[in-house]
Amino acid sequence: MAGLPRSGSTLLSTLLNQNPRIYSGPSSPVLGVMYSTHDNFISNELYTGYPKPDQVNEIIGSVIEHWYSDIDKPVVIDKNRAWCARVPFIEGYIKQEAKVIVPVRRIDEILSSILTMIKRNSFQEGQPRINFVDEYLVKNNIPINDETRCQHLLSPDGIVWESLNATKLGVEEGHSDKFLFVDYNDLVKDPQKELNEIYEFLGEEPFEHTFENLSNEHREDDITTYGLSDMHEVHSELKKVSTDPSEILPDSMIELYNSNKSNLEFWNVSKSVKTVTPIVTSPVPIDPSSKTYNLFS
């Protein structure tokens, strides 16, 4: 599972875990460990002096198996927002076609959700850290307000930009047929329908879910990791409770969203056609050696 923040991935995992065949946990370090292990071997002169690629492939590929060695379920869903940008990498190790569930949501709703969460989690004496957004602003001597928060979230160092970029890269590389986009508002409106589509995508039999008394059984240490105590909290009843973004976002951010909506929310196009309109008119890498694109024209 990949996708965008504040787009229902935790809710989706909570629902999928009702199915006795499925384990869907919190964000995992699996991809990062696999990638860094790969890079460490490639850059190690002892390895380049006497390479053993088959053994290295076995070592890297075994990370998934060992990380989930405590899980006895036939279907395991790993969560990392970078999976969309690493499809060929993971397919080289799992030896089968990747299938990535991609939760998405209107970008203005994502931004307003994050701002709302920050405001209801004001810093308390004794907390290990302030929220991760304001922490970045403080470290970079940037004034803290809703506009700078949104600007950071939509910058290359922000989680919204990073997840959008990773997803876009996967689409641009031609892997959209391996992605199932799940819109947050569709999930809340008709959850069973969305779950049935996920089961069809995964090749699993449908499963009848319940949508009351929900609880995230795989809670992360949100206050230590993000400085936000309810980052991955799930409401007991499935319903949309968010406020209209126009009541929360600064006017400048609303204008920015409205003028870039079709570029930002590119998945609405990719659902129906394989070739999509790029995020910018002509996707130009920020760095010729890296695969990242500007989000705004």
PLM region descriptions:
Residues 79, 90-117:
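Conserved phosphate-donor/acceptor-positioning beta-strand/loop module used by diverse small-molecule
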Residues 8-22, 90-95, 115, 181-206, ...:
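PAPS/PAP-binding and catalytic site of the sulfotransferase fold
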Residues 1-3, 76-79, 102-104, 181-183:
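Short beta-strand segments
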